[in-house]
């Protein structure tokens, strides 16, 4: 079924919904950060990190159901039911980590208890997203927009009726998760579900559960950095500054939406060269100008979250290339693992799997995470001993991450070359996007982007929207005149819009 996925269509639906959700997400995070203390905001980020650890067991299902469905199997019912069963173990894990973490940050057990419901909802949401990714990737983008919108509605209601608190922020996420699950279920093809629970499918997943467990461990071990930072500093202020910068930098990651449909497409047997190059071109088309724009507008963007975060602009500057590099990592990993066929072999052994790219690719991430955590622990301990500022420690944190993530990209590129994988980087397109972004930045600076005066939050948001409109106009006019790929997309979009209008009339 994945052969029928249209990467461009699914990518633009997903990217468009993420861009729309940027505004709702910005509204939500602004309401929360401006009404919570830095301590409470950092505590909230800690709770979210613990929830992410608690959903780790679910990867046993999601890893294999994506590969199964992409090849035409129909085990969606089994995946959903087994996911809900595993959520019980996830709750136990959440409570254990919370019992260790809560005393370190003031013993605020009530907030950890309120957030418990997020664990089973996250299990269900992640599994439904995986099922949609294999069959109808655009549904994930639509559901994400609903998720963000629901959070804003709850936050605004709370702001108007009663005071925003950490409990309100947690409740908003819970309501949004319920809405997201409902949309995903409504949009999924019914033929994916069978009226039976396949015990044999579950046995097959559990037999090789070590592989997705390893891959997920390799990816998630890096998130322990929040716990390390909190434990060493006995404070959430450094975490708050680091996360605030990454909230802004994460806008760039939305360009990675174009790679979302690539993995199941390749698993289903699509050719690598054309699909991967197209996805890389689309990703660079948006990530390059977004990176440039956020770099120039770093201080005002952080100020929206609260005046206390404006000094974290250097953290944001470093976080920008980290996120941009992450999008390229995502494409390289999809190419390397998407065409791996070891799981189709008859009774593959542990040794067979350990030699496959399903194992070697996450191994790169694991080694990088271990190096990063050790470096972070040593550096933070030293900086804390000399009473360095929270921003200084956050900058060091970001610098360590980029120094570790960059070599991994080179290694994955080398792996593709050695395996004979044909992958051509769109260097000419990227040069055009870089030139257009440079001109865009020059226009923004000339228009006063570096001299924004202190104004109210609402005025600042509208001022930034003006710069966004100006930057978009400059950038897209330039690439329309210079880039054939963008022109083809633009004309195709116009044709689709005309077709929709004709049908509506």
Predicted regions and their residues:
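Hydrophobic transmembrane helix module of multi-pass membrane transport proteins
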Residues: 84-214, 442-445
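Hydrophobic alpha-helical transmembrane segments
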Residues: 142-190, 249, 363-382, 387-415, ...
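Signature of the first transmembrane helix
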Residues: 4-60, 91, 95, 114-118, ...
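Interhelical loop/hinge segments that connect adjacent transmembrane helices in multipass membrane
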Residues: 1-3, 113, 141-142, 166-172, ...
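Interfacial/gating helices of multi-pass transporter permease domains
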Residues: 24, 28-53, 166, 204-208, ...
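Helix-loop junctions and terminal segments of transmembrane helices
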Residues: 55-73, 250-273, 277-283, 333-344
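Alpha-helical transmembrane segments of multi-pass membrane transport and lipid-handling proteins
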Residues: 23-26, 57-59, 80-106, 157-160, ...
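Membrane-proximal transmembrane or re-entrant/amphipathic helices at the cytosolic face
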Residues: 419-421, 428, 445-505
């Amino acid at each position: 079924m994945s052969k029928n996925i249209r990467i461009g269509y699914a990518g633009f639906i997903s990217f468009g919904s993420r861009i729309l959700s940027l505004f709702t997400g910005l509204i939500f995070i602004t309401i929360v950060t401006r009404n919570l203390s830095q301590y409470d905001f950092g505590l909230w980020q800690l709770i979210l990190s613990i929830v992410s650890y608690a959903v780790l067991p679910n990867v046993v299902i999601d890893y294999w159901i994506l590969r199964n469905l992409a090849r035409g199997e129909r085990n969606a019912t089994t995946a959903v039911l087994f996911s809900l069963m595993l959520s019980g173990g996830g709750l136990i894990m959440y409570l254990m980590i919370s019992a260790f973490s809560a005393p370190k940050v003031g013993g605020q057990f009530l907030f950890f208890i309120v957030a418990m419901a997020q664990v089973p909802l996250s299990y269900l949401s992640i599994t439904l997203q995986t099922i949609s990714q294999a069959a109808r990737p655009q549904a994930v983008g639509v559901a994400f927009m609903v998720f963000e919108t629901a959070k804003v509605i709850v936050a605004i209601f709370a702001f108007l009726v009663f005071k925003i608190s950490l409990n309100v922020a947690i409740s908003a996420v819970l309501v949004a998760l319920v809405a997201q699950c409902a949309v995903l279920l409504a949009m999924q093809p019914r033929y994916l579900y069978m009226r039976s629970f396949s015990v044999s499918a579950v046995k097959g997943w559990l037999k090789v559960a070590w592989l997705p467990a390893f891959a997920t461990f390799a990816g998630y071990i890096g998130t322990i950095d929040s716990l390390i930072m909190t434990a060493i500093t006995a404070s959430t202020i450094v975490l708050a500054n680091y996360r605030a910068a990454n909230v802004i930098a994460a806008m760039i990651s939305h360009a990675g939406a174009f790679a979302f449909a690539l993995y199941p497409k390749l698993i289903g047997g699509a050719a690598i060269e054309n699909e991967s190059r197209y996805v890389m071109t689309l990703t660079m088309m948006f990530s390059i100008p977004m990176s440039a724009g956020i770099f120039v507008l770093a201080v005002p963007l952080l100020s929206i979250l609260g005046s206390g975060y404006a000094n974290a602009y250097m953290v944001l500057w470093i976080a920008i290339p980290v996120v941009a590099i992450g999008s390229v990592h995502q494409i390289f990993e999809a190419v390397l693992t998407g065409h791996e066929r070891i799981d189709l072999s008859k009774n593959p052994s542990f040794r067979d799997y350990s030699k496959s790219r399903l194992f070697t690719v996450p191994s790169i991430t694991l080694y990088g995470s271990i190096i990063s955590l050790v470096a972070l622990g040593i550096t933070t301990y030293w900086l804390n001993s000399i009473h360095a500022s929270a921003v200084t420690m956050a900058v060091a944190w970001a610098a360590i991450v980029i120094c570790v993530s960059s070599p991994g990209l080179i290694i994955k590129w080398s792996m593709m070359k050695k395996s004979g994988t044909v992958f051509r980087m769109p260097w000419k397109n990227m040069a055009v996007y870089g030139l257009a972004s440079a001109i865009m930045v020059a226009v923004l600076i000339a228009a006063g982007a570096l001299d924004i005066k202190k104004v109210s939050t609402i005025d600042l948001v509208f001022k930034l929207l003006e710069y966004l409109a100006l930057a978009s106009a400059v950038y897209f006019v330039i690439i329309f005149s210079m880039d054939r790929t963008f022109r083809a997309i633009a004309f195709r979009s116009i044709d689709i819009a005309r077709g929709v209008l004709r049908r509506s009339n």
